[in-house]
């Protein structure tokens, strides 16, 4: 019935700041930048007078994986606040990225001002084996995760 995941959409308050973070801090590559408005945009979003900008980014290391879709609603303006302030809330809680060296990536991102929940933690996960994981926030408070398999 369903095919592969097409993209992961994240609504942001400040597109330029979000693009800087995902492109310049995390190292994703911009694939496209579009503006959407009109009746179709109003219908699909169930809002009136929609004008939104979408920027698509993807890791150059995983050309088959789904891109990240950053959405900025120019009109109507989005609500203030942070998404899912607690991981225990229902809904999509995080976007995870595989990395080769989690400790080095953690150190590099901290040096760039990225705020983390904690240092990387080691888990035994059925189907994956040993995995190191750590959560952090993007500029809008969306939770992101780094993962590394450990032998």
PLM feature spans:
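Short, solvent-exposed beta-strand edge segments and adjacent coil->beta transition regions
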Residues: 3-7, 52, 90-94, 131
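Non-DNA-binding regulatory cores of transcription-related proteins
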Residues: 85-88
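Core segments of cupin and vicinal oxygen chelate
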Residues: 11-65, 104, 126-129, 135
